Amino acid sequence: MLHLIVADSELETIPEEMLDDPGVRRFAKKRNKRVDRMILDSNYMHAFIDKYYPGESKRRGRPDIIYILLEMAQESILNRKNLLRTYIHTRNDFVIKISPITRMPKSYNRFIGLFEDLFEKEIITNNGKTLLSLERMKLDELLESLKKDRTILLHPKGEFKKPSEFISTEDIAAIIGGFSEGDFRSDVSNIPEKYSIFRDELTIWSVGLEIVASYERAIGLL
């Protein structure tokens, strides 16, 4: 089993400091949404993020990168064989558990709407089956709850190795960062296995794809 953990993901609802901003409220009215139930999205709110959090507008409000990664993970052979579990840990210490049967909407706007519903209801079901669930949980608490043989961290400053050199058939928890720049907010210093798989910067979905595909090869699916 591969547990793919996207840690410190920049996925959040509108922060309290921004709730009364006239521009944000106009955007909410345009979407016919309550301001406090909207997901922060820098694609539309870049200027507002920069206004309230100077220097963070390239990092915060990035549900788009989570969407791309989940499209890859949920459609993978590994997931279709029920050997992948995907978790989104957010900057505010929520954990979203993605059921293997869940398929992401093909439309990005529908994805945003789905996750806005999740933040409001804390669970999304279909025909009695849980597709998505959300709960308060820190990264170390999530790791503690998983049955695994090893925990690995993908990090630009980790030991440079090909995935085939450290991915095995064991049950592995693989942590990748859910942000486009900067470093982990959570304390990951106690994770002994830290690896870098490429000399240059990669997108989080590229890293996720390499890890998933390498695990598929290791267990003989490819």
UniProtKB/Swiss-Prot annotation:
Pfam families noted in UniProt: EMG1
SUPFAM superfamilies: alpha/beta knot
Keyword Ligase belongs to the record: no
Gene3D superfamilies according to UniProt: 3.40.1280.10
Residue sites binding S-adenosyl-L-methionine per the record: 177, 182, 197-202
Keyword RNA-binding: yes
Record site feature (Interaction with substrate rRNA), residues: 62, 103, 106, 110
Site features described as Stabilizes Arg-62, chain residue numbers: 64
Role: Methyltransferase involved in ribosomal biogenesis. Specifically catalyzes the N1-methylation of the pseudouridine corresponding to position 914 in M.jannaschii 16S rRNA.
Recorded family membership: Belongs to the class IV-like SAM-binding methyltransferase superfamily. RNA methyltransferase NEP1 family.
Oligomeric and partner information: Homodimer.
Name the record gives this protein: Ribosomal RNA small subunit methyltransferase Nep1
Species assigned in the record: Thermoplasma volcanium (strain ATCC 51530 / DSM 4299 / JCM 9571 / NBRC 15438 / GSS1)
